[in-house]
């Protein structure tokens, strides 16, 4: 049985679990309930009306957070030849080909985003078990498999706060919005960008209610239920 400490118990007293809060109210409440000694991450969890086993109902995409994630993002690029030089010029923190792949196989994982040129993917593919489970595998659908001329744009987006979202096996999307230390308006604008991207990425096979429930929470805090009408209204901005 999971037990919670006094700080959590005090925090949850602020929450009325029978209420579905407007996004701005939910953010304010989540910030007030953030009682950890570190700067907690603020996350949103959406239960989608999608079947993860249905090929026509897969959801995957990218959102760029206008206020970033509140951390320094290290970008790695798999490239060789002229493309490797382009990665350096574009500002990648780590870049390379075969030797970089060997380095990762040996345990190197000091990066937050991985990008690859299309021609490198046949080699990068063997890192699937290492990178896939950490959400670091380059993927064309998430815009991280690109030609060298797109490196600068993708790297800049990653540093600004480029976040990927994907439907998990339970039909839920988990996505980071920023840090509890962010001002409420910053988190609200990040949330708006995320919801808009998710609505714009609605699969062609989706049927019925697209978003079934939405919750906001900090790393150590309780979940705050969001008003679905208000959340859905964020789409199409």
Curated annotation (Swiss-Prot):
It comes from the Bacteria. One of its GO terms (molecular function) is tRNA binding. Keywords: Repressor, Ribonucleoprotein, Ribosomal protein, RNA-binding, rRNA-binding, Translation regulation, tRNA-binding. GO terms for cellular component: large ribosomal subunit. One of its GO terms (biological process) is regulation of translation. Signal peptide: none annotated. Part of the 50S ribosomal subunit. Binds directly to 23S rRNA. The L1 stalk is quite mobile in the ribosome, and is involved in E site tRNA release. Belongs to the universal ribosomal protein uL1 family. This is Large ribosomal subunit protein uL1. It comes from Dehalococcoides mccartyi (strain CBDB1).
């Amino acid at each position: 049985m999971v037990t919670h400490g006094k700080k959590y118990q005090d925090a949850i007293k602020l929450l009325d679990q029978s209420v579905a809060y407007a996004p701005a109210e939910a953010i304010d409440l989540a910030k007030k309930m953030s009682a950890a000694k570190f700067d907690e991450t603020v996350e949103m969890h959406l239960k989608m009306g999608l079947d993860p086993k249905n090929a026509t109902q897969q959801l995957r995409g990218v959102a760029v957070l206008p206020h970033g994630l509140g951390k320094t993002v290290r970008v790695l690029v798999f490239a060789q030849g002229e493309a490797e030089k382009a990665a350096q010029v574009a500002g990648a923190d780590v870049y390379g080909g075969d030797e970089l792949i060997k380095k990762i196989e040996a345990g190197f994982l000091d990066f937050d985003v991985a990008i690859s040129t299309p021609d490198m993917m046949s080699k990068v593919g063997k890192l699937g078990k290492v990178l896939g489970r950490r959400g670091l595998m380059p993927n064309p659908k998430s815009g991280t498999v690109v030609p060298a001329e797109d490196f600068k744009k993708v790297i800049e987006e990653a540093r600004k706060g480029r976040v990927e979202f994907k439907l998990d096996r339970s039909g839920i999307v988990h996505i980071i919005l920023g840090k509890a230390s962010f001002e409420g308006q910053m988190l609200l604008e990040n949330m708006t960008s995320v919801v808009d991207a998710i609505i714009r990425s609605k699969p062609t096979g989706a049927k019925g209610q697209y978003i079934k429930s939405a919750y906001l929470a900090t790393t150590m805090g309780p979940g705050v239920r969001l008003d679905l009408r208000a959340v859905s209204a964020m789409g199409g901005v």
